Amino acid sequence: MKKIIMTILCLLLLTGCTTYEDTNGDDPALQTITDQNIILKDIGASGLGYTTMELGFLHSEEYSSKNFNGVEELFLANYIWASDVTVYIGHLNLKSGNFKLVLVLDDEILFEIPLDAFAETYTFNNIKGTFAIRAAGESANVEFYVEVR
């Protein structure tokens, strides 16, 4: 009985996972997932693994995937008072597929991280509201490092 329930549960979880094919060759731009999907986070994600480290206000994560699909929220914070937020990208390496890494403030994309980012620091002043870092991928073979201070 346990095996039947686990099998049904696994099948239900997998039905929510959608694979997005890379239909535009070497162009890394997203083809199916829109900015609106990223802002609303209205589609799920699969295939993205990570390791995380938190030391006080420092939050860092190393991500990698051979086949990342969907929209994944990497960081979320609600700033009640105007705050300065620093995002450090250690590296971003897209090997194949389509990928976008963005910073979202409330209901708009604040900034898109360049796909060739390497040891880049981005500082945003007077951030107030819901701040998120989101990744979107379509069959993306990608690895990247993100740190939020």
Language model segments and positions:
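Short, surface-exposed beta-strand/strand-loop-strand elements in extracellular ectodomains
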Residues: 95-111, 146-148
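Short strand-edge motifs at loop-to-beta-strand transitions and within beta-strands
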Residues: 118-122
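C-terminal motif of bacterial Sec signal peptides marking the signal peptidase cleavage site
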Residues: 13-16
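Short proline/glycine-enriched turn/loop motifs at strand-loop junctions of beta-rich domains
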Residues: 82, 93-98, 137-141
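Transition segment at domain starts
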Residues: 19-78
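Exposed low-complexity, polar/acidic, P/S/T/G-rich flexible segments that act as propeptides
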Residues: 139-149
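Noncatalytic modules at the cell exterior or secretory-pathway interfaces
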Residues: 85-88, 123-141
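Positively charged n-region of N-terminal signal peptides that target proteins for export
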Residues: 1-4
